């Protein structure tokens, strides 16, 4: 086992604090609408330019192991906030730095770290309750666009695209962000349910110009096994022909005689038909087939349920307004499933999302939920250079998470004002002793720091602005760093999602409390470099 280096009390906290400062000082310059860029060297390719706090935090690794511990714990604040709220990482880092700094001073002055922590927890609970009480639910598309714009560092175009995407696919819909091949940013919306399986044979194509199958008002047969012969299906096919409607077959596979017969019938014009393979694999395939059945109002033809293909009637088939199939994807638009069944299914998937511990499973469940709830939107981010595209994509990702958070828990005035206004609530917090009161005061000073930093990054005097803001009682009145004016921030569109502000404060206080109550640090001792032996002489 390698020898360890151990540091105690003040020495340990000082080392950690240095690491906290290095990381937080690099991150906090990105805060606010006038936040500066940070350039990160990459071992290959062009350097990366970003204004995203968590991206900067993840790149920082310090040589001194004790300093690095402090830096990594604050990095954890940024990562946790990014995971939970998707934005607010820089605010969380700035808050953590402020709480640790103030806390370290109090501990050095001889106060009890555990009582300080209790005081911090009491203050945070009071502020969270205040934030929830003041949060305003989002009602209009404009407000969604404003949240997106603020999170994207004032980029109106990004805010507009996000609002449009959320309007089209709903709050539960999947919105993905990709890099575009062109200069322009564009939005593509796939309405209805889309899955990544194309037609089994190109002979099914009805639109030869676009090489795709288009079926209007079709019946949909959902079968979980392979189809290799059509003998058992003949009664059903005859009923479909008589109805005059097209038929889509979704099965594990369609092969051999079955495929040949279907293609021949299609080419002769007797039967408008197409076949696709079922999406997914294993248990996920069963679940996705059931989703399609519920969406279209049909029944999954499965031997588990005791339904044989020869007994299937038209009433067991699903219906949709339109189905479009190309080489790679199938899209079912406007399925005829009962609304209450679809809602029950989405509720069931939501419960599974809450219970699952696997990130991969969660992602797949969210995709299924979105397909049932209304569709998928893709925002393709354009730019003149690869560096610019990557930087914009970072901002779009941030903005997307922020808008989702805003829809979830409502909005608050931005610019750090919501936290600043919460100082009043702290006057009513009851503490058991002087050290706990000092913990409350640590938070009182820390929640002023985001406003100061935003103002400082905009080139103004932070203390002056904070003093001016505290003179006035109006909750949403604040300093708009983008324009340099004092105004009602909610009316001006300077807003933050309540979830982002709340998560940033809770995560910062949680990790900062741990740093304050740390009494010893243990790290591996650096190994001394062994002297290399001289190479033997080569005088042959």
Swiss-Prot record:
Root EC class: isomerase
GO cellular component assignments: cytoplasm
Binding site for ATP: 30-33, 51, 87-91, 415, 480-482, 496
Subcellular location: Cytoplasm
PROSITE patterns: CHAPERONINS_CPN60
Function (record text): Together with its co-chaperonin GroES, plays an essential role in assisting protein folding. The GroEL-GroES system forms a nano-cage that allows encapsulation of the non-native substrate proteins and provides a physical environment optimized to promote and accelerate protein folding.
Protein name (record): Chaperonin GroEL 3
Organism this protein belongs to: Bradyrhizobium sp. (strain BTAi1 / ATCC BAA-1182)
Lineage: Bacteria, Pseudomonadati, Pseudomonadota, Alphaproteobacteria, Hyphomicrobiales
Originating gene: groEL3
